[in-house]
Amino acid sequence: MFCYQCSEASKGVGCTTIGVCGKTPDVANLQDLLIWLTRGISYWALKAKEYGVKDDEVNLFVAEALFSTITNVNFSAKRMVEFIERAFELRERIKHRFLEAYAEKEGKTFDEKVPEAAEWHKKGGVDLYELKGMEVGVLFDKDEDIRSLKQLLIYGLKGIAAYTDHAYILKHTNDDILYFIQKGLVETLREDITVDELVSLVLEAGKVAVDAMALLDKANTTEFGNPEITEVYTGTYNTPAILVSGHDLLDLEELLKQTEGTGIMVYTHGEMLPAHAYPKLKKYKHLAGNFGSAWWKQSEEFEEFGGAILMTTNCLVPPKESYKDRVFTTGLVGFDKLTHIPNRTDGKPKDFSPVIKKALELGPIPERKGKKIVIGFAHDQVSRLLDKVIDAVKSGAIKKFVVMGGCDGRHKEREYYTEFAKKLPKDTVILTAGCAKYRYNHLDLGDIGGIPRVLDAGQCNDSYSLVVTALKLKEALGLDDINDLPIVYNIAWYEQKAIAVLLALLYLGVKGIRLGPVLPAFISPNVLKVLVDKFNIAPITTVEEDLKVLLS
């Protein structure tokens, strides 16, 4: 195996024997094959589009397949093989539909040279799939800079795919996004592609990342209402309980409906914390609070929780034997020997009765005292405070906004973000989204004239809210350039959705981003130079030095 898609790449180079995340070599190689096959599917899907042939199932499958390969989503070789077999089926279907349309319109048989990813299929099962995955994986491209840019593009596409898939679950669609994902994948098959062409594609991916986040924002707010300022309890009550982690709000809503009147309290974990701010979800009285913190602490937090646990999307950490029997997966999440809740069929909700049954069998969890944290500062809510915020900026009460969105992770270096937040001057406000918030949302940083010094917009996809807020501030302050705002960026990344957010910021022209805790292993020195020269991206250094630079 060779994998370097997340911030935990072994020794800053890549994982070659087992992923730091827990991904095994067989799964890594199968995922590489699946990604390669999505490129082949995309080749035929784009050809078909030229001839007026569209297959919605094929188009969404490409996004779902990419999503399934994001860090900490799927650890199951069995599930990967199922994806691969389905990829072969759908590739043949869209290929056949294109060839028919081509022959009908052109009056001849299609005879262009076809990339291997659009044709290869041999019988031999999982062993052969693994071998092919090793052959067509990350290291296939020998030129370091071309490889770096192709992987940067692919990882951005994975993030876009994740956000788009979440929107599609809520019946909000955008064909242009899915077709761009396919375009990007097909372009990475080209052996003659240039650095300049790839840089252009990467920036275009940033634009589409904005579109994908906007689509998901519209889906979430249409379905669940605009987030409101909300206090969330972080303790637990002495009742049977279910803990929901991941990102899928519809899964949570369906579970809340199915647990009404059962005596079960439902708690959020990790990136599900923002669910409490949505009016349609907060009306459920048994949505009791948020237990625990960021994804990487789940091994201890899931064990301590004591109730049933539902994992709706990433980030799953390979579970301990001590609590494995009470962890359930659903959607694209995969881990062998965990009970999986099947997808919706015929428009019916998912059946969470196995989770509910387990929670009742386990009985009441311990009561734990907790504090309250304030969330709900998505763009609609912030726009209601905009006059107050503008007045604070103009009066000098707020000198800087510091965007500290992104991901959290297990490495000690991430304590930097807690210290950075603690040492920010009292005339600064943190804008955050994603699980990076857990490094500082428990700190008592106070407020500025009633404006909390930590404004939590929500999940990582709600980085879109931070963008909208920045653009509204730019307009209100009469500025021409987003970089003229009193906003600086200190972004923590972990996986591929954060890469999509980073590309979105670059597309919007944001300069001077500090990125940490480490730079991506897949960024070659020459590609890094392009990013530094064009966007002034820099790695974090020390808290003191970065405060000096960012607040100057």
Swiss-Prot record:
Cofactor: record remark: Binds 1 [4Fe-4S] cluster. Binds 1 hybrid [4Fe-2O-2S] cluster.
EC number: 1.7.99.1
Keyword Oxidoreductase included in the entry's annotation: yes
Organism superkingdom: Bacteria
This protein's GO CC annotations: cytoplasm
List of residues binding [4Fe-4S] cluster: C3, C6, C15, C21
SUPFAM superfamilies: Prismane protein-like (SSF56821)
Keywords, ordered alphabetically: 4Fe-4S, Cytoplasm, Iron, Iron-sulfur, Metal-binding, Oxidoreductase
Cofactor: [4Fe-4S] cluster; hybrid [4Fe-2O-2S] cluster
Compartment list: Cytoplasm
Chain segments annotated as coiled-coil in the UniProt record: none
Cysteine persulfide modifications at: C407
GO molecular function, one term: 4 iron, 4 sulfur cluster binding
Catalytic activities: A + NH4(+) + H2O = hydroxylamine + AH2 + H(+)
GO biological process, one term: response to hydrogen peroxide
Binding locations of hybrid [4Fe-2O-2S] cluster: H247, E271, C315, C407, C435, C460, E495, K497
Known function: Catalyzes the reduction of hydroxylamine to form NH(3) and H(2)O.
Similarity comment: family membership: Belongs to the HCP family.
Protein name according to UniProt: Hydroxylamine reductase
Organism encoding this protein: Thermosipho melanesiensis (strain DSM 12029 / CIP 104789 / BI429)
